[in-house]
A protein has these predicted regions:
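Conserved N-terminal beta1-alpha1 strand-loop-helix module at the mouth
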Residues: 1-89
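Active-site flanking residues adjacent to catalytic metal/cofactor-binding acidic residues
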Residues: 23, 92, 121
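Conserved anion-binding
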Residues: 26-27, 32, 98-193
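A general structural detector for well-ordered alpha-helical segments in enzyme core domains, enriched
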Residues: 44, 48, 76-80, 106, ...
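Active-site-adjacent beta->alpha loops and helix N-cap segments on the catalytic face
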Residues: 68-83, 99-105, 124-138, 199-206
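Short helix-capping segments at alpha-helix termini
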Residues: 85-88, 182-187, 208
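Long, hydrophobic, well-ordered secondary-structure blocks that form the structural core
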Residues: 89-97
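A short, acidic, amphipathic alpha-helical segment used as a generic capping/interface helix at domain edges
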Residues: 177-181, 197-208
Length: 208
């Protein structure tokens, strides 16, 4: 079992829950006081963490909402590691994906500067392009596979022709098949993002 999965399992056992708390400070759902400034946002984050720390097996941070506040917002995102219990894993929901040195920079930013234990990433430039993220054997990657947004079927359910290594199938199933074949998957360092609104997809994904 990978370090991340061990950390997550221990955290879940400690709090008696599998709850992952989203830190998604959408200004549309915050009070004016909390949305108006980074200081207000920091207070909202503190209240949320204090109210959920005894129940949360993990925290998922939507970094875009912090980036929208500029440099001070990103600095607040860096503080989240210190604000949450040290033994509770943090997932950075960033859906990153690029190539070469850009992914190396993303890995440093997410894992080192922000202290993420796991991140979400897009496989659509090729899973191998994410090597700098995958090479961190103490971290975990959730690959976008079958997402819950209404537009997802436009690409994710496209039928692909069969190859020597795979049958004819939808694109999201091919992503899952390619991910499962990676050595990082065997080491417990790759997971999939599959939206709960696509219940039928779960059955197919478990068969891959």
């Amino acid at each position: 079992m990978s370090r991340y999965l061990e950390l997550l399992a221990a955290s879940s056992q400690r709090v008696g829950s599998s709850l992952c708390v989203g830190i998604d400070p959408d200004p549309a759902h915050l009070s004016l006081e909390h949305a108006a400034s980074v200081a207000g946002l920091r207070e909202w984050v503190r209240i949320l963490i204090n109210a959920t720390a005894q129940y949360a097996a993990a925290y998922k941070v939507n970094l875009a909402f912090f980036e929208a506040y500029g440099a001070e917002g990103v600095a607040l995102a860096e503080e989240i590691r210190a604000l949450t219990p040290a033994e509770t894993p943090i997932i950075m929901d960033v859906k990153r994906g690029d190539i070469g040195n850009t992914v190396k920079a993303q890995a440093r930013a997410l894992f080192d500067a922000l202290g993420a234990d796991a991140v979400t990433a897009s496989p659509y430039l090729g899973i191998g392009a994410l090597a700098p993220l995958l090479e961190r054997d103490d971290r975990f990657i959730y690959l976008l596979c079958r997402t819950s947004n209404p537009e997802s079927a436009e690409l994710q359910e496209l039928r692909l022709t069969a190859t020597e290594a795979a049958p004819e199938e939808e694109l999201y199933l091919r992503v899952a098949r390619l991910a499962a074949a990676r050595p990082e998957a065997l080491a417990g360092r790759i997971g999939l993002v599959a939206g709960a609104t696509a219940g039928g997809a779960f059955i197919k994904l478990r068969e891959v």
